[in-house]
Amino acid sequence: MGKIIGIDLGTTNSCVAVLDGDTPRVLENAEGERTTASVIAYTDGETLVGQPAKRQAVTNPQNTLFAIKRLIGRRFEDEEVQRDIEIMPFKIVKADNGDAWVEAKGQKMAAPQVSAEVLKKMKKTAEDFLGEEVTGAVVTVPAYFNDAQRQATKDAGRIAGLDVKRIINEPTAAALAYGLDKKGGDRTIAVYDLGGGTFDISIIEIDNVDGEQTFEVLATNGDTHLGGEDFDNRLINYLVSEFEKEQGINLKNDPLAMQRVKEAAEKAKIELSSAQQTDVNLPYVTADATGPKHMNVKVTRAKLESLVEDLVIRSLEPLKVALADSDLSVDEITDVILVGGQTRMPMVQAKVAEFFGKEARRDVNPDEAVAMGAAVQGGVLAGDVKDVLLLDVTPLSFGIETMGGVMTKLIEKNTTIPTKADQTFSTAEDNQSAVTIHVLQGERKQATYNKSLGQFNLEGIQPAPRGMPQIEVTFDLDADGILNVSAKDKSTGKEQKITIQASGGLTDEEIEAMVQEAEANKDADKKFEELVTARNQADQMIHGTQKQIEEAGDALPADEKEKIEAAIKALEEVKSGNDKEAIDAKTQELMQAAQKLMEIAQQKAQAQQGADAGEQPKQDDDVVDAEFEEVKDK
């Protein structure tokens, strides 16, 4: 089996790691960075990912997509999506199936399709390092992701050409990375994971028994729409309102200006983690009839903290729930680990330390721990890592809608996965010949307040008084946290099974079409890369030849010079085109024509060497080395 890589597919940044011997190793991308910005830009004929996409965002805001993880597996009507529509510079649109999709360059795309571009870059980074094709991956998701979001993440992997061997929760992955080299006694750790768009808290017990480490998740909780992007947005709104007070102009109507403000806010937020004050200075941010306008706003750490304090406090509520669910008190937590870039904010660190009554550990890299843990799990699945057992849990309860619009739970939240549960139900009316099984995920008793995962019918039930037929419903939850449901009529043996495909979500046909499109683009991207390489070689050849013509001077016969210049002109005519073969052919012709230049250059070099040898002075045998001391006039 080939290497199974570990990928942290983040809202703001993504990271890829691989097991190097026994140690997880974070890999650098083509730009030499250990994390890749989860930003995708669509330009004329090219798709940019990471830093190249981020760099051009100011001039191309409508076609530069970021924080797509906030949309993955979500419906357009979701309250969180509606909030994002107001603040995102790109278009969020409603798909035919009701999902939240995005639009760029006039093309509508599903969130998994866009996220697949980031996964493709992670895959390529690993392949460049390993020198072989990579197909297997462990991809992490927020612990509090529901079934639809997990399924959509797997779909993104498939579109990127990856076989997602396992979906694991981000805090659990971080605990794996942290605990792997801690071979001491048992410990109970709290992983507080505040990333770019999501927040999780997991309470995990690490046991060491006879050399085997067991990582058991006791409880998990969180908020899939709370993260660094929300902190950025608070600061963006403050900067925009300050500018409006001063200049009377609302920048929210200007996408280019808003993109600049977004970048400046993100930078200021990061600076305020180490400085007490920073200046947000944006010259020529916009203009009106009176001329150009500049933004210059001083932001103190105290001001930023006042803007986001409620967000930090909001993150503490899930901590209380997770502790209660695991039947533990704060005193029983051995270590606190902070994961996610937003945990670098001093206020976050202080509030978490205050809650747990202890400082968080400093020996965990908040940006890399999750990918490293995913690589460890990849090693476990590939058989390269022995003596490590991971027991994760489902973050939310699963059940079905029963009479009166009630949700009846079959699998409770924080149940260790994989797991299976069944329960027998009956009909609500006399002579009922079919039942609809409506599958739900959530914690509310009222069915409508929970997430609908889908529904299916069991037909052909024999007529009988209500309450008589015996219908056995079985829930089978796999290690990825994805649900399979079956319903069986015990009297007839008729059975209906489904893998939960939410009322939204991508169908297999849609995913396959996207895989084919990605493959086609892969070939197109390769051809484009080859074309650019050919153009660059042509440029170098022209520049080098022109330089040699100058150096050759009169030594180059006029007819040869004419021949070479004609070859240069022919190459210049084709090098801007899209015909790689023509560029290669004309480059070759120029090389042939420039043979005379090579001969002249060699002759000159040989003549120079001969001259240098003749000019060397004869050593006088009577000369004696002496040391001189400089005498200065007094």
Swiss-Prot record:
Modified residues (Phosphothreonine): 198
Family: Belongs to the heat shock protein 70 family.
Induction: By stress conditions e.g. heat shock.
UniProt-recorded Gene Ontology molecular function terms: ATP binding; ATP-dependent protein folding chaperone; unfolded protein binding
Record protein name field: Chaperone protein DnaK
Domain of life (superkingdom): Bacteria
Function: Acts as a chaperone.
Region entry Disordered, spans: 601-634
PROSITE patterns: HSP70_1 (PS00297), HSP70_2 (PS00329), HSP70_3 (PS01036)
Low complexity: compositionally biased ranges: 601-613
Keywords: ATP-binding, Chaperone, Nucleotide-binding, Phosphoprotein, Stress response
